[in-house]
Amino acid sequence: MWIRQDWLDNLGLEVPRTWDELVTVAEAFVTQDPDGNGEADTIGILGPSNSDHMNAVGNNQYGLDPLFSSFQSYPQYWLQDEDGTVKYGSIQPETRTALEKIQKLYTDKLIDQEMLVRNDSKEPLLAGKVGIFFGPWWSGYTVADATLAGEADWRAYFTPLAEDGNYYTHMPNPTRDRKSVV
């Protein structure tokens, strides 16, 4: 999770560690003019573009996978529970809960209102209008671009903890890449 530290500082906010704290920070980023330009023109949480996915198995720049993981929801994954039963993650109760929470973020305008419609999610990021985004390991390059484009102080933090106080993420098992040995 990448957050504008300068916006946190401007508003006197702490780094969010839980879902509720994330919602509080996103709301402040949308309603309290963190960039100080006197306009209501900031996006709390950036969403994926029209060529990306809300969640994905693999490459997912600006996707919302960490929000799903906060509820131990893993859409598009086949999961094995404690007794060995295989279940499809997209239809589990945890996914419904995650979708309801994400829907509320959208309804409350705390998440990108143009997500999945916008042609390029990087545009508002480079324009300095975004407070939080999620991305894979190579997001540091995006942050470097955004920093060069303005005064942004982006920092990487853990995504929100689940209600049980643990940190969850998704990772295929077994994990593999596209290398071959001949």
What role is predicted for each listed range?
Residues 1-182:
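Extracytoplasmic/secretory soluble proteins
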